[in-house]
Amino acid sequence: MATFKVSRVETKPYDGQKPGTSGLRKKVKVFAQPHYLENFVQSTFDALTADKIKGKTLVVSGDGRYYSEQAIQTIIKMSAANGVKSVWVGQDGLLSTPAVSAVIRERVGKDGSKASGAFILTASHNPGGPNEDFGIKYNMENGGPAQEGVTNKIYENTTTIKEYLIAKELPNVNISKTGVTSFSGPDGQFDVEVFDATETYVKLMKSIFDFQAIKKLLSIPSFTFCYDALHGVAGVYAKRIFVDELGANESSLLNCTPKEDFGGGHPDPNLTYAKELVERMGLGKSNTQGEPPEFGAAADGDADRNMILGKRFFVTPSDSVAIIAANAVEAIPYFSGGLKGVARSMPTSAALDVVAKHLNLKFFEVPTGWKFFGNLMDAGVCSICGEESFGTGSDHVREKDGIWAVLAWLSILAHKNKDNLNGEKLVTVEDIVCQHWATYGRHYYTRYDYENVDAGGAKELMAYLVNLQSDLSKVNNIVKGVHSGVANVIAADEFEYKDPVDGSVSKHQGIRYMFEDGSRLIFRLSGTGSEGATIRLYIEQYEKDSSKTGRDSQEALKPLVDVALKLSKMQEFSGRSEPTVIT
């Protein structure tokens, strides 16, 4: 058994190591600077109490993006030096973010241990490669992202760090082969266990969903299916679940080989970046591929996000979570005993609110960031939650879960088609959504993203909008000047959240303008980009009249869009005449 000593390496703080909503994300060239990664990892160890580190087991894996291999080896060596007893690594360093959460919560190691936390190496939906993004975040023993108290402490430590601990001479571990490698150090034996990345997660999915019912659906000749992993880590799980377990043809999988640069693409499952899937589903500009599949879905780099499509039909994430919640008890065995409650992020449309009211469920509106849902789940008051940024999930783990959302939709389709196994007239994705609108009304919804805007201009825009809120008569003069048919603004504020579980308060979570007819305009600066600022504008309008729920959303929302752009002086502050992405 190889032995190692602990080295103390002198270092100096780097500016800007403040974790955002999902960890620290920077360009690879920033992370590759001497001591940069080590400073952040040591600051994380120092922010955690000894009982969470000494003699404990940690998970270290990620989405396979460029720089992951080096980072995993560094974190293994630093874990050994900081008194960790065992490190678990997914084979090839791969684990989806929801799978990491499942592994922390469910897996038992060869030595009988359970994990007390994880370093997840991902920048989620951001591009990968030598000139692109890398990221790291820490998840706690509940499987969820570190709470603000911990991330604030990590940041504080990064500003004062003087040294880090590392087992320099520990040889690199072969992470392509499953098995345990053991070393001897000052605190005794240190193990690195490389394990099958899919096993724990697949077992969990099989305990939640009726795989036989989904298999029957996929065997209907007229039910065609397409899944695009955008060369992210989801591909590993897609092959195992959709092909091996559920019997789908391998030809129904697109871009399911993980690549460190995501094939040169942008692994963000939306109508702009998932071009190949969008074309195949009949939603592209050209429609030369014949009849589209009945169901399509896509994932982001670390497989926590999802996009759901029907044939020539896009399901908004806000509608998706509402439809899953409305059908969960009937269609998904895990929820057969009823839902504890539901929650959405503030910018997400109020479609879920209407379902909660209709079904008499507890309902919560939280800031953007999955950790807020985790608190509600740990308290046993939330079963299903979602956010407009293509994140949907439930209390089976403490992260959003892209493949879970796809299986939820397949379960609903299987349930609606259970008496229709010859597939003569399938109940389609579009049918399910339109039936939902007929029952609950429709929330027309769109999001405008202005990416990599000058940070100064973005901050000025937000400050201007806050100041404007103090004079609603001025606001309504601007509104009516743009479009007389738009309802009056009756309230405007900056969203603030008091956590009902731990009492913590989160301020400055987005600027809201609320209209008399239930419409909303929301402005936020995003915390997930690696440079510049991203301004997000959310526009929502509720339509109860079922005869008016079939309009094109961009057409229905045009008056409100015009109001939002004028009200915010978007072009003046951002320097952009149009958004980077419209969803």
UniProtKB/Swiss-Prot annotation:
Its cofactor is Mg(2+). Coiled coil: none annotated. It is found in: Cytoplasm. GO terms for cellular component: cytosol. Its main location: cytoplasm. InterPro entries: A-D-PHexomutase_a/b/a-I, A-D-PHexomutase_a/b/a-I/II/III, A-D-PHexomutase_a/b/a-II, A-D-PHexomutase_a/b/a-III, A-D-PHexomutase_C_sf, A-D-PHexomutase_CS, Alpha-D-phosphohexomutase_SF, PGM. Residues 1-20 are annotated as: Disordered. The modification Phosphoserine is found at residue 124. Gene3D superfamilies: Alpha-D-Glucose-1,6-Bisphosphate, subunit A, domain 3, Alpha-D-phosphohexomutase, C-terminal domain. One of its GO terms (molecular function) is phosphoglucomutase activity. Monomer. NCBIfam families: PRK07564.1-1. This is Phosphoglucomutase, cytoplasmic. The lineage of its organism: Eukaryota, Viridiplantae, Streptophyta, Embryophyta, Tracheophyta. The gene is PGM1.
